[in-house]
A protein has these predicted regions:
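Alpha-helical transmembrane bundles and membrane-interface segments of multipass inner-membrane proteins
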Residues: 1-175
Length: 175
């Protein structure tokens, strides 16, 4: 019973974090649509950073333009994979970071997925004009932070054997 209670607590926190972050992403996009669509950019730091409304029908750096069905399929596959991961991931303090990373990454995927389903494109609005960096949004920030977290976790925090929970094969008994 204690294990089930801990599992429910971890999954509950994972889901709450996903929902809060997805709502934050959608709220920022709603503000941008309301205040920036068909308007001039809002310059925050002249020559460096501004808010710029953009309807992105592709992926990062403009690849895969107008391939909505591909993004929908990939997001569904990703969501199935992350829920499998969260189901398999140990529910203890040692793995809290992985739960957080998976939840933040999922919020990023869901935020852009909702845009694609609802609008047919993703609303982007952060623009670093100084380096002409592609316009991005809060969900994109969640994805990037998550991938950095994954890299740091793999390289510096967890040992290889701590990822055995991801193995599909059954452990051989040491008899």
């Amino acid at each position: 019973m204690v294990k089930n209670k801990k599992t429910i607590q971890f999954i509950g926190v994972d889901c709450i974090l996903m929902v809060i972050l997805t709502l934050l992403d959608q709220w920022t996009k709603s503000l941008v649509v309301h205040h920036l669509k068909d308007q001039s950019d809002i310059i925050l730091i002249p020559g460096v950073f501004q808010l710029h409304y953009l309807e992105n029908r592709g992926a990062a750096f403009g690849i895969l333009q107008n391939q909505r069905i591909i993004f929908v399929i990939l997001t569904i596959i990703y969501l199935a994979a992350v829920f499998w991961f969260l189901h398999r991931c140990p529910k203890n303090g040692r793995y809290t970071l992985l739960h957080i990373i998976a939840s933040v990454l999922t919020a990023g995927a869901l935020g852009n997925f909702i845009d694609r389903l609802r609008l047919g494109y993703v609303v982007d609005f952060f623009y670093f004009s100084l380096i002409n960096f592609p316009v991005f949004n809060v969900a994109d920030i969640f994805v990037v932070i998550s991938f950095i977290g994954i890299a740091v976790s793999i390289l510096f925090i967890y040992k290889d054997d701590e990822f055995e929970f991801l193995s599909i094969r059954k452990k051989e008994s040491k008899a």
